[in-house]
């Protein structure tokens, strides 16, 4: 019998002033129940009880074509339902007259939630696809690198040349395959294209990124210029290379999917300005080097300081791979010469050399060259990537060279300013003025609680602060669609105006066009007849001749208000035309008198007959629809009190067996607990521990008492009003559990010291419906008797107390009932996604997390 949907939302610690060590733990939970079917039955005015648990479902499905049931079933626990929990007399009157109570679709939130779920599923599917695609790229890259490692491990230049030729042949064969097989292009071409772009990107920026990260990991240390060759750092370097490689590959894939593109910088081709080196380098401080590294674990460096016997091999390798590195001055001069000879009108343009890398947020240095593979550097400097000018592949060698160094070339222009990398805000990032931690505030505003400044229980001073830890994800989003009786912030609606000052174009309805044509056809004989009648009746109807179209409208479409209100223009035009006909066509009256009556009779006979047939069909349909429907009017005692009308519509949600003889007094209509909420509370008490006796200190007409008895517990029902005791006994007999309840007419404040029970249920009077108008409900001053006093007396009976309170009760006062260092669970009771009440549980009734039990 417990609620189907119950969740633990948050834990809130309340710290007492001057006693920070004695904090009170407040467990916050939410319970959701629904009774839309019972409410719909109350609106229909009858109730049929069957043997099943879903009472009244069959009757609801049979009547109204299953409308009410369909409406109820279309709302789940997360949807936004009609404002059906509380209907005033005016709304009830509007509903009975068939007028709408609201505008817009009821299922707006459900449609929004379905669309959000679909969007989330698509995002998850895309992420899985990207991850799978990335894994395939990783596997292929590893396989290729291992193959390159096996070939480059040997010093034989012929094997390297053979490998380069094989690689070129493979790429060419792949391109040919893509050209020959267009259908396979969708699966192969994106992968090949992304791989090539990534290789270009990594060859251009990878070295700088590796070396910069290596320096950040080892600050203040004397770094080796070749950590990949140093035995102590070789293994660490390989791990460092692998981590950064796959990290930036993933980032590259992500940013490329977001629409970013990578274009290698334009510069002269390497082969154009590759110059022959001479053996008599006099002042070469930085020697020519060759980068043959494709895998970090096997770097191969060729230095021109080696013996003369290996110079020939070096030259062959340089010609085969074209990975040449000169010192900065020679490269600059070679660039200027080759670019001038290659293209007469092409000149080196000075551009900013600091470009932002989308994937890494890094930028290439400005000191005369681009970043390089850090494992291909041979300098003894601690920052070799920043000072060398080499490239890691022949295809990209000497690309992206922004401008020449200051020694050669045109120095008339100043260097471009160094641009700082711009930080692009992602779509899910918050603005600077937004608070990123708004979901985790210390006030617990997302819970919908009310905090007041009333007196605390047990002499506790005010609470210094609160700490809230949310236990449920997306609390803000879920709370947004719950009606917690607070002001809802609506989004601003923007009205967009066109730049051109033109009149707005309204699309004309097809039905309206047909009606205009019909009226034009009908008004031709009617205007002539009206003119005849106006001349033969002593000008009595002269003033009304301009309204012939209106008279015809009433004869043709009697009762059709839509066309009369929305189409005034045709009437005006027709009146003007009819007046013109009276002045200009008087001489044709005699000739038309013979034809007008025949046409008019045809129209006036056919149209009313069709309208009469439609009216009769509608009346017959309504009679069949209302056939066998039993409508109960308001009882005299309810009709005499207009403010009880809306509670009468909710009678089945108060007692599902209302028609079996349930009786209520005026105060009982206001104070009785809805049956579904009472059923949830009783079920929770019965499931907490073995409970035999429950005291209902303020039983009223027996709403909670009956539900406690239905769970099998014995109940002591107490109330000071003998009328309510009689009503509660009658209602218990209707449910057949009067033998499990002991009714006592007396004052709980006087009887508390003589009672013994396992659980005490407190639901004192809240002062009528006016309790909801208060911003915060003070449980000490706004209840009679005093809320603190009845709790103190209940503690003498047992520590297991259930306190049933209004939804706007002061949470600080409720928490203070637990005492310093104590615990309390405050449960919000939602009825059809609307916050109705809160229930405070003390003692063993608290549902603690599984880790604490």
From Swiss-Prot:
Acidic residues: bias regions: 431-442
Biased composition (Low complexity): 367-382
Domain of life (superkingdom): Eukaryota
Tissues with expression: Ubiquitously expressed. High expression in heart, skeletal muscle, kidney, liver and placenta.
Sequence positions bearing Phosphoserine: 55, 85, 89, 96, 141, 154, 189, 412, 438, 578
Catalytic activity: a 5'-end (N(7)-methyl 5'-triphosphoguanosine)-ribonucleoside in snRNA + S-adenosyl-L-methionine = a 5'-end (N(2),N(7)-dimethyl 5'-triphosphoguanosine)-ribonucleoside in snRNA + S-adenosyl-L-homocysteine + H(+); a 5'-end (N(7)-methyl 5'-triphosphoguanosine)-ribonucleoside in snoRNA + S-adenosyl-L-methionine = a 5'-end (N(2),N(7)-dimethyl 5'-triphosphoguanosine)-ribonucleoside in snoRNA + S-adenosyl-L-homocysteine + H(+); a 5'-end (N(2),N(7)-dimethyl 5'-triphosphoguanosine)-ribonucleoside in snRNA + S-adenosyl-L-methionine = a 5'-end (N(2),N(2),N(7)-trimethyl 5'-triphosphoguanosine)-ribonucleoside in snRNA + S-adenosyl-L-homocysteine + H(+); a 5'-end (N(2),N(7)-dimethyl 5'-triphosphoguanosine)-ribonucleoside in snoRNA + S-adenosyl-L-methionine = a 5'-end (N(2),N(2),N(7)-trimethyl 5'-triphosphoguanosine)-ribonucleoside in snoRNA + S-adenosyl-L-homocysteine + H(+)
Residues with the Phosphotyrosine modification: 146
pH dependence statement: Optimum pH is 8.5-9.5.
A GO molecular-function annotation: RNA cap trimethylguanosine synthase activity
A Pfam family matched in the record: Methyltransf_15
Modified residues annotated as Phosphothreonine in this record: 60
Ranges of compositional bias, category Basic residues: 620-630
Location in or out of the cell: Cytoplasm; Nucleus, Cajal body; Nucleus, Nucleolus
Subunit (UniProt): May form homooligomers. Interacts with CREBBP/CBP, EED/WAIT1, EP300/P300, NCOA6/PRIP, PPARBP/PBP and SMN.
The family this protein is said to belong to: Belongs to the methyltransferase superfamily. Trimethylguanosine synthase family.
Protein name from the UniProt record: Trimethylguanosine synthase
Native organism: Homo sapiens
Underlying gene: TGS1
């Amino acid at each position: 019998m417990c609620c189907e949907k119950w969740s633990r939302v948050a834990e809130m610690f309340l710290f007492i002033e001057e006693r920070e060590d004695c904090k009170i733990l407040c467990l916050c939970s939410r319970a959701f129940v629904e009774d839309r079917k019972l409410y719909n039955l109350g609106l229909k005015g009858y109730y049929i009880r069957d043997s099943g648990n879903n009472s009244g479902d069959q009757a609801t499905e049979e009547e109204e074509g299953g409308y009410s049931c369909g409406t109820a079933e279309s709302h789940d626990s997360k949807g936004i339902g009609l404002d059906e929990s509380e209907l005033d007399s005016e709304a009830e009157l509007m509903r009975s007259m068939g007028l709408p109570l609201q505008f817009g679709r009821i299922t707006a939130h459900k449609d929004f939630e379905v669309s959000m779920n679909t969007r989330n599923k698509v995002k998850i599917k895309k992420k899985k696809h990207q991850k799978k695609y990335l894994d395939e790229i990783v596997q292929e890259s590893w396989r290729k690198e291992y193959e390159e490692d096996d070939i480059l491990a040997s010093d034989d230049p012929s094997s390297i040349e053979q490998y380069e030729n094989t690689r070129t042949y493979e790429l060419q064969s792949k391109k040919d395959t893509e050209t020959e097989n267009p259908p396979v292009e969708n699966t192969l071409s994106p992968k090949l294209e992304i791989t090539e772009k990534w290789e270009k990107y990594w060859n251009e920026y990878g070295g700088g990124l590796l070396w910069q990260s290596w320096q950040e990991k080892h600050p203040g240390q004397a770094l080796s210029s070749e950590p990949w060759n140093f035995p102590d750092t070789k293994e660490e370097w390989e791990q460092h290379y692998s981590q950064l490689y796959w990290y930036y590959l993933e980032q590259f894939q992500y940013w490329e999917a977001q629409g970013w593109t990578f274009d290698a910088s334009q510069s002269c081709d390497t082969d154009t300005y590759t110059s022959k080196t001479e053996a008599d380098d006099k002042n070469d401080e930085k020697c020519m080097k060759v980068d043959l590294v494709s895998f970090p674990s096997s770097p191969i460096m060729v230095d021109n300081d080696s013996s003369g016997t290996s110079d020939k091999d070096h030259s062959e390798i340089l010609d085969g791979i074209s990975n040449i590195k000169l010192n900065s001055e020679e490269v600059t001069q070679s660039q200027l010469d080759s670019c001038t000879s290659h293209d007469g009108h092409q000149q080196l343009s000075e551009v900013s050399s600091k470009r932002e890398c989308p994937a890494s947020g890094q930028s290439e240095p400005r000191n005369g060259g681009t970043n390089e593979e850090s494992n291909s550097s041979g300098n003894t400097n601690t920052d070799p990537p920043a000072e060398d000018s080499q490239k890691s592949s022949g295809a990209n060698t000497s690309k992206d060279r922004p401008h020449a160094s200051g020694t050669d070339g045109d120095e008339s222009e100043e260097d471009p300013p160094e641009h700082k990398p711009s930080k692009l805000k992602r779509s899910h990032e918050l603005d600077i003025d937004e608070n990123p931690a708004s979901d985790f505030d210390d006030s617990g505003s997302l819970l919908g609680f009310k905090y007041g400044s009333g007196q605390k229980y047990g002499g506790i001073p005010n609470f210094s602060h609160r700490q809230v830890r949310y236990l449920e994800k997306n609390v803000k989003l879920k709370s947004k669609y719950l009606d917690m009786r607070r002001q809802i912030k609506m989004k601003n609606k923007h009205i967009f105006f066109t730049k051109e000052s033109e009149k707005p174009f309204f699309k004309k309805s097809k039905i309206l066009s047909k009606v205009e044509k019909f009226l034009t056809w009908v008004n031709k004989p009617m205007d002539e007849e009206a003119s005849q009648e106006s001349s033969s009746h002593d000008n009595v109807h002269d003033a009304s001749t301009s309204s012939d179209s209106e008279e015809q409208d009433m004869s043709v479409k009697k009762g059709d208000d839509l066309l009369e209100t929305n189409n005034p223009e045709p009437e005006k035009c027709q009146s003007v035309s009819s007046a013109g006909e009276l002045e200009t066509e008087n001489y044709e009256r005699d000739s038309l008198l013979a034809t007008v009556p025949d046409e008019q009779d045809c129209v006036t006979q056919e149209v009313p007959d069709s309208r009469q047939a439609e009216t009769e069909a509608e009346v017959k349909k309504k009679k069949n629809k209302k056939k066998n429907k039993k409508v109960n009017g308001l009882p005299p005692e309810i009709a005499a009190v207009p403010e009880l009308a809306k509670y009468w519509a909710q009678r089945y949600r108060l007692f599902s067996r209302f028609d079996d003889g349930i009786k209520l007094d005026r105060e009982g209509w206001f104070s009785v607990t809805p049956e579904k909420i009472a059923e949830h509370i009783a079920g929770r008490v019965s499931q907490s521990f073995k409970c035999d006796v429950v005291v209902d200190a303020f039983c009223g007409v027996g709403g909670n008492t009956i539900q406690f008895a239905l769970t099998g517990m014995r109940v002591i029902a107490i109330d000071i009003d003998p009328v309510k005791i009689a009503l509660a006994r009658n209602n218990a007999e209707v449910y057949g559990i009067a033998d499990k309840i002991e009714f006592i007419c007396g004052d709980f404040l006087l009887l508390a010291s003589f009672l013994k029970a396992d659980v005490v249920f407190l639901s004192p009077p809240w002062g009528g419906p006016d309790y909801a108008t208060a911003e915060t409900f003070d449980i000490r001053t706004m209840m009679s008797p005093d809320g603190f006093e009845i709790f103190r007396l209940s503690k003498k009976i047992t520590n297991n107390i259930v306190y049933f309170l209004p939804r706007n009760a002061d949470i600080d006062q409720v928490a203070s009932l637990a005492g310093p260092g104590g615990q309390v669970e405050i449960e919000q009771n939602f009825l059809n996604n609307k916050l109705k009440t809160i229930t405070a549980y003390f003692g063993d009734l608290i549902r603690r997390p599984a880790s604490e039990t």
